[in-house]
Amino acid sequence: MIFKVFYQENADEVPVREKTKTLYIEAESERDVRRKLEGRPINIEYIQPLEGAHLEYEKKSPNFQVLEISS
């Protein structure tokens, strides 16, 4: 499944909506996403599963690139 992760680049700062970034990652669950991203200096705000029409819509975005991280 593909997940869209909303995050802040600096885990030490208070989240500011205007600085929120996104990435796409393939994983089996939200817990798997967090495990794959642990150790990175980011502050995860929200993890959204993408499927169906929503996934197809996101694929049309020029920023859609699935991050591949081995388990």
UniProtKB/Swiss-Prot annotation:
A single GO BP: DNA-templated transcription
Known EC number: 2.7.7.6
Database matches in Pfam families: RpoY (PF07288)
GO (cellular component) term, any one: DNA-directed RNA polymerase complex
Keyword tags: DNA-directed RNA polymerase, Nucleotidyltransferase, Transcription, Transferase
InterPro entries: RpoY (IPR009907)
Reaction equation(s) it catalyzes: RNA(n) + a ribonucleoside 5'-triphosphate = RNA(n+1) + diphosphate
Keyword hit for Transcription regulation: no
Function summary: A non-essential component of RNA polymerase (RNAP). Has a similar structure to bacteriophage T7 protein Gp2 (AC P03704), which is known to bind to RNAP in the DNA binding-cleft. Unlike Gp2 however, this protein does not inhibit transcription initiation.
Protein name (database record): DNA-directed RNA polymerase subunit epsilon
